[in-house]
From Swiss-Prot:
The chain crosses the membrane at residues 5-25, 88-108, 111-131, 236-256. It is a multi-pass membrane protein. It catalyses: eicosanoyl-CoA + 2 Fe(II)-[cytochrome b5] + O2 + 2 H(+) = (5Z)-eicosenoyl-CoA + 2 Fe(III)-[cytochrome b5] + 2 H2O. A motif (Histidine box-3) lies at residues 302-306. This is Icosanoyl-CoA 5-desaturase. Its EC number is 1.14.19.10.
Amino acid sequence: LRLSLYFPISISLSLSLEAMASFIATTTPAMPAFASVLDPKIPTKPEPKTETPKPKDDLERFRTSEVVLERKAKGFWRRKWNPRDIQNAVTLLVLHALAAMAPFYFSWDAFWISFILLGFASGVLGITLCFHRCLTHGGFKLPKLVEYFFAYCGSLALQGDPMEWVSNHRYHHQFVDTERDVHSPTQGFWFCHIGWVLDKDLFVEKRGGRRNNVNDLKKQAFYRFLQKTYMYHQLALIALLYYVGGFPYIVWGMGFRLVFMFHSTFAINSVCHKWGGRPWNTGDLSTNNMFVALCAFGEGWHNNHHAFEQSARHGLEWWEIDVTWYVIRTLQAIGLATNVKLPTEAQKQKLKAKSA
């Protein structure tokens, strides 16, 4: 009895639904999708294409490489730390502790010799002038003895030997603001500021640990020597500072100096890819930040730098203070810096931002 009742009811119901669907499709243009659910055979008009909403954040808006942007998975602290990461973390903690002692061990000779003089030699002559604008980008040339002396000074900044530093920065420009960037902002502000220093496995993961973009430096015995003996020079400097001025020289020379230079350099990777102006259409996240420029000897004019990577001058306007450029200009005046590269007016007009 149940079966005899079921079949007539189901047949009549399906016929009723089919008739209803045909009626809706032919009489109500606004409801073809509903009709197609009732009867898939009924053709429906394709839905009009809607424009993809513009991304809200700069990370998507300034995609500059074929590499897909991906955010680093959480778990930075819970991951397995390799010995070098642990060593770097302990070193950073010790140096920050020394820097915090600086007010209690202040003396004018420690301030001027360990911080100002040694900071200028390692920070300006070493990192920004030699490592960055000369070795990485070839913005100018120096006599080999002068280049090697400045490179040695840069090694005392504890930011890596010349080959490691230059390799990281060349990769940064090659894969700027993508997951293959050594300190990509796609990984978050903390990571691109200092976290990348504590995650060496990431370099191995992304590039197999290869530094095949510094063959020009690998060919030179001096840079291979600095790479192999890098830590010995740091220990020698500590011994020299202690011999000359005791513990206050250690506090100001190995604590305050290095921490100040660390965060000045790291701010270029983090702050200057987040806050500031973009007068040039570089297609990336680089910005000009005056505060960072003052702390990092002119390196904070980072959008200028990404627009004209080989330019020896980063502060392109008269009011953009660029201490490193003033030193390069002085070296050029006395004949030590040659083949100094600057952007042409044609290059500037090509990259000038519309809003600038």
